[in-house]
């Protein structure tokens, strides 16, 4: 909530994080029906003349932005790690493809099916490796942990959506029914690409952090740019339009 109304104050120092308990003035005006993850309720809350005691302040006064940014690291990493649970859908589809027969043989013998399994398990293992890498970076307070967590959240949740759909594709029409839990997994996993920051926002954070690492980081690695045969041809390294015209005009 807004606690500092001084317009000259930095925007990150204008809000505070508080815990609002259920009581007079706190109402749920609308409950949303959800495509998936129906175990958690989602609704529109309305606060009318609600008083919050100072003891319900989370962190320091006016430090709500700091609390939010600190909270996003574990939230996004949790989203990434939870996405690895899509392994269950792949396992169900893999077992099904071994039992289901078509044209006299298990459908796993058709590359159109088995290659979906190969792609899916590769994506799953790659995502798992990135999630563990990001978790290790957070534990070690590594300077690139914010980027790695954003990458893990984006990559793992995209992977989960793709793998869940591959599992349904392997199983065909029966995967679309509630005889198997694949349809539920597909509905549930879709939210992971949206909550705790959409994957488009993750791209924004990733590129920002990586540019900062490359452009502001120390040049302690070998400068591979100097490996070019014409490494000293500075006149040919056109960075702006004027450089291009100057080179071509001789």
Give the residues covered by each predicted segment.
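Generic, well-ordered alpha-helical scaffold segments in large soluble proteins
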Residues: 71, 89-96, 133, 137, ...
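Glycine-rich beta->alpha junctions and the first turn(s) of the following alpha-helix
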Residues: 17, 26-125, 150, 192, ...
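A short core secondary-structure module
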Residues: 1-28
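Short, cationic motifs built from Arg/Lys/His that form the positively charged side of catalytic pockets
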Residues: 1-4, 76, 96, 100-102, ...
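C-terminal helix-coil-helix/basic helical segment that borders enzyme active sites and/or dimer interfaces
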Residues: 94-105, 121-155, 168-171
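Alpha-helix capping/hinge segments and adjacent helical runs
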Residues: 37, 143, 147-246
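Residue-level signature of the cytosolic catalytic core of signaling kinases
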Residues: 11, 60-61, 109, 141, ...
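Short, solvent-exposed loop/turn segments at the edges of secondary structure
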Residues: 13, 40-42, 187
